[in-house]
Design a protein with these regions (language model features):
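N-terminal nucleic-acid-engaging modules of covalent nucleotidyltransferase systems
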Residues: 1-160
Length: 160
C-alpha cells in the first residue's frame, strides 16, 4: 500500500491516532496471516515502519543493554500526558549502534529511560521488546515474514 498523506501524518493526529501497542495488539488478535497483514497496511505510517524495522532488521543493533531498564512506568490514562511513538520514532536513531557517536553510552541509556517514562506503559514495554529484538514474542503472529509482506520489504528491509 502506498503511503498516503493521511497515514504519513499520524504523528500529528494527536490522541485520535491509535498507540502503537494498540495496532500491534490488533495484529496479535487477527486470525490469520492475511488479516495480520491487512491490519499493518491499514495502519501504515513512517513511525510504525521505523519501529518494526528496528525490531526485525538484523542489521540494526541497539546500543543499549539487553533487558528492561530501571524506569518509572507512566500510569496516566491513555491519551493524556503521554508522548507517543508516533512523535518519538524520529529520535530512535540515537539508540542504534554507530549512529550517534557524539553521545556517550550512559547518555543514550538515560535518554532511553526518559523516552520510556514519557510513553504509555504498554508502548514503553513494546519499545523494550523492540530493543531486545523480542517483539514477536510479545505479539503472536507478528513475524519477520508478515512485516516484510505488509510493507513490500525485501530481505534488506527495503522496498523492492
Amino acid at each position: 500500500m502506498p503511503m498516503t498523506t493521511a497515514n504519513l501524518n499520524m504523528a500529528t493526529a494527536g490522541s485520535s491516532a491509535p498507540l502503537l501497542h494498540e495496532i500491534l495488539t490488533k495484529v496479535n488478535n487477527a486470525k490469520d496471516k492475511p488479516a495480520k497483514i491487512a491490519v499493518l497496511k491499514k495502519n501504515d505510517s513512517v513511525p510504525l515502519r521505523q519501529v518494526l524495522k528496528g525490531a526485525f532488521d538484523p542489521n540494526i543493533k541497539w546500543d543499549l543493554p539487553e533487558g528492561t531498564p530501571p524506569y518509572k512506568e507512566n500510569d496516566a490514562p491513555a491519551g493524556t500526558e503521554h508522548t507517543t511513538l508516533f512523535q518519538e520514532a524520529r529520535r530512535l536513531w540515537h539508540f542504534v549502534e554507530g549512529a550517534d557517536q557524539k553521545l556517550s553510552k550512559t547518555k543514550k541509556e538515560m535518554m532511553f529511560i526518559q523516552l520510556l517514562e514519557g510513553l504509555h506503559k504498554d508502548d514503553a514495554a513494546l519499545m523494550v521488546a523492540v530493543k531486545d529484538k523480542a517483539l514477536n514474542k510479545k505479539y503472536k503472529g507478528l513475524t519477520d515474514a508478515v512485516v516484510k509482506e505488509a510493507f513490500g520489504w525485501n530481505s534488506d528491509y527495503k522496498t523492492s
